[in-house]
Amino acid sequence: MAGGSSMEANEPRQLFIAGRKSALIRLTCAAGMRPALLEVLNTYADSLGDEPGTEMFMVHLDPDDENNVWLYETFLDDSAALAHRSTEGFAKMMNDMPPLLEGPPAILRMEPLRMSVQESVLTEDWSL
């Protein structure tokens, strides 16, 4: 089941992921522009095969504010984060977003340390 979840919990997989880089980004779109912003983000996400060091790119909708869209990104290291910002797809996304936003993105840079994930997340069929 695509994107579905099972309530059966197993022993989670514990991963030490020090050395990676991540970012939590808040995008506040102009009123009524969320569908257009999501289209830009989805188009960009479709190009992530060109970024082998981008390990995770997640788009989140804010349940409390329909004008906020959150991104969570994880990169193998600093070089991968730099390469991410140097791609053609990233440049296009950054060119397409400003007219859709109320202001500049709010970026919180982080250094992940540990991840706990249920094995079922890794084996489910999440294809679109």
State what each model feature region is.
Residues 28-38:
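Short, surface-exposed ligand-recognition loops at beta-strand->loop->(often short) alpha-helix junctions
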Residues 33-35, 79, 115:
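Residue-level signal for secondary-structure boundary sites
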Residues 20-28, 58-85, 127:
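Short, well-ordered beta-strand segments in beta-rich or mixed alpha/beta enzyme
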Residues 2-21, 59-67, 95-128:
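Glycine-rich beta-strand-turn "strand-cap" elements at beta-sheet edges
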Residues 2-6, 16, 43-55, 74-109:
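An amphipathic, aromatic/His-enriched active-site/gating alpha helix that lines ligand/cofactor pockets
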Residues 22, 34, 90-93:
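A general structural signal for well-ordered alpha-helical segments in protein cores
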